[in-house]
Design a protein with these regions (language model features):
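Long, ordered, helix-rich scaffold segments
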Residues: 1-162
Length: 162
């Protein structure tokens, strides 16, 4: 069931929301399946949907999502940031804003997980100018955060200055 859903869902323009909902209903009591459910939606190809990042962000409000659970947080946020290059590098920079917002939020709860999310920025200087400028703004949002953990400050130093 999982493999079939993945092959249908990820690259299709069709949302298959009925299949996604069915998978959730059948597996909502299995933690690993819930992580997969969030991850699958995070890696879907956006097909030019300008609200795609908003849709991913709205999944954080789902009753089964708990950002304090590291596996659940990474299944949605980590999957989007590391595995969805089209969504992450959206034309309006919303993917970078989503990343920065979540790094700052997770840093207050779990600095180790936040610093691992920071690794997504290691290659920002290789982006073309348009994307590099947007990414840099997100990096400076994180940099200006009060009470940022030592873990994230160290990563930020490496990312910005090396």
């Amino acid at each position: 069931q999982w493999a079939s859903l993945c092959s249908l869902y990820i690259k299709s323009k069709h949302t298959y929301q009925d299949l996604i909902n069915d998978f959730y209903d059948r597996n909502k009591h299995e933690e690993i399946s819930l992580d997969r459910w969030f991850s699958l939606q995070a890696i879907k190809y956006p097909h030019g949907d300008e609200r795609f990042v908003q849709k991913i962000n709205s999944l954080k409000e789902h009753k089964s999502f708990n950002i304090e659970n590291p596996n659940r947080g990474m299944s949605l946020i980590g999957s989007f940031c590391f595995a969805n290059i089209y969504g992450f590098h959206s034309n309006d920079g919303s993917g970078y804003d989503f990343w920065a917002q979540n790094v700052m939020e997770i840093d207050r709860l779990n600095p180790q997980i936040a610093s691992s999310l920071m690794k997504r920025a290691m290659d920002w200087k290789r982006l073309n100018k348009k994307y590099r400028v947007m990414f840099e703004k997100s990096l400076h949002k994180i940099e200006s955060t009060q009470n940022l953990s030592i873990n994230c400050r160290e990563m930020l130093k490496v990312i910005l200055f090396e």
